[in-house]
From Swiss-Prot:
Purpose of the protein: This is one of the proteins that binds to the 5S RNA in the ribosome where it forms part of the central protuberance.
Gene: rplY
SUPFAM superfamilies membership: Ribosomal protein L25-like
Lineage, uppermost ranks: Bacteria, Pseudomonadati, Pseudomonadota, Betaproteobacteria, Burkholderiales
Organism: Janthinobacterium sp. (strain Marseille)
Record-level GO cellular component terms: cytosolic large ribosomal subunit
Protein name per UniProt: Large ribosomal subunit protein bL25
Length: 214
């Protein structure tokens, strides 16, 4: 994905305000051996790009005054209640150095899993993204989580996920194999099934004497 930007000379709160009035978003690109560069981006183009999932987890081609560098979107700020992007930070990447980034998890085959198809269960997503490390060329837009074999009372853990080649998960909090998704039967459904079973047992018990008289 390509991002067009321009180097900006004026800095400070007043300059940033004037840029936003002019339809531009101030930003910065940093990292690597080059000095940080303050930039301006077209606000509307950036606003719509930020709505795309891939924009947050892909290597971007950032063109600043005709010079193209590969970067990652590292941070952005938006207005509390206006549809306004206030600032964006981009980090340069080196093709030979591994990067550390969060990528979204895509859950597939929930409808055909035993938990849902056979038991009418609910699958809860414990995590929605995954911290990974890899070379820029190996960066996936997302990591797929296959729920096809998930049954009620069981979980999907990190070890159950097949990571793309060259990609390693970054573990936090000392947990070696964190839970990614769980499957359970809704409480109301469990109670309804228990009531139905009790009613069936009562009916069978009531019918038993009549059957014995035959």
């Amino acid at each position: 994905m390509k991002v067009i930007a321009f180097a900006r000379k004026e800095l400070g709160t007043g300059a940033s305000r004037r840029q936003r009035i002019a339809g531009l978003t101030p930003g910065i690109v940093y990292g690597g051996t080059a000095a940080p560069v303050n930039i301006s981006l077209d606000h509307n183009a950036l606003y719509h790009a930020l709505k795309k999932e891939a924009f947050h987890s892909s290597i971007l081609d950032l063109e600043v005054d005709g010079k193209v560098e590969q970067v990652l979107l590292r941070d952005f700020q938006v207005h509390a209640y206006k549809q306004l992007v206030l600032h964006a930070d981009f980090q340069r990447v080196d093709a030979k150095q591994k990067i550390h980034v969060k990528v979204p998890l895509h859950f597939v085959n929930a409808e055909t899993s035993p938990a849902v198809k056979l038991h009418g269960g609910i699958i809860s997503h414990v995590a929605s993204e995954l911290d990974i490390t890899c070379l820029p060329s190996d960066l996936p837009e997302f990591v797929e989580v296959d729920l096809a074999n998930l049954d009620v009372g069981h979980s999907i853990h990190l070890a159950d996920i097949k990571l793309p080649k060259g990609v390693a998960a970054v573990i936090h909090g000392g947990e070696d194999n964190p839970t990614i998704a769980t499957a359970s039967v809704p409480a109301g459904k469990v109670e309804a099934e228990a009531d139905a079973a009790a009613a069936a047992a009562a009916s069978a018990a009531a019918a038993a004497p009549a059957g014995d008289k035959k």
